[in-house]
Amino acid sequence: MESILRKDIWQIRSAHEGGGRKREMQEKKYTIRAMTTEDYPGLYALWMTIKGFGIRSLDDSQEGVERFLKRNPNSSVVAVASDGAIVGGILCGHDGRRGCLYHVCVREDYRRLGIGKAMVVHCMNALKAEGINKVSLIAFTRNDVGNAFWNTIGWTRRLDLNYYDFTLNEANITAFNQ
């Protein structure tokens, strides 16, 4: 894998050989950059392709994501293929004390190319630049692919905590992709 860091943009060339048999090497080019509000249609389209992905009716609406990006303008990221399609994304923000990653995803045919790790590094660097020293995320226990990813890149699964939430707006319904 060849990586070139230019300011805040990563251009990564990856050769990918799929399946258990030899195939013609296929080069997939992509760029990692800060997310903008204009990315929402492509990001939403990506979310809809991810099996088991939970979409919240208010928080994950265009208005909800725009509000999140306004509060956290420099830390969220997308991976964009050479054809302009969004193939990865992370909503990343902080409360002044701890960072949090939301909706970390990579399109299935772009996985295992280093995109996920490069996006996480981008987010962690953005958080460090804002004086944040710790970051967390939530991964569903049934998300085998995601949990394997976090273990592989060295994140610590906390067994000493319980996670609680409370829905303030009952209209903010979560629907899971099938």
Predicted features, each with a name:
Residues 112-125, 152:
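Conserved acetyl-CoA-binding loop-helix of GNAT-fold acetyltransferases
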Residues 151-160:
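Conserved acetyl-CoA-binding loop of GNAT-fold acetyltransferases
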Residues 137-146, 165:
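Conserved beta-strand-loop-alpha-helix junction that forms the acyl-donor binding cleft
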Residues 4-6, 10-12, 16-38, 170-178:
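Conserved N-terminal entry element of GNAT/NAT acetyltransferase domains
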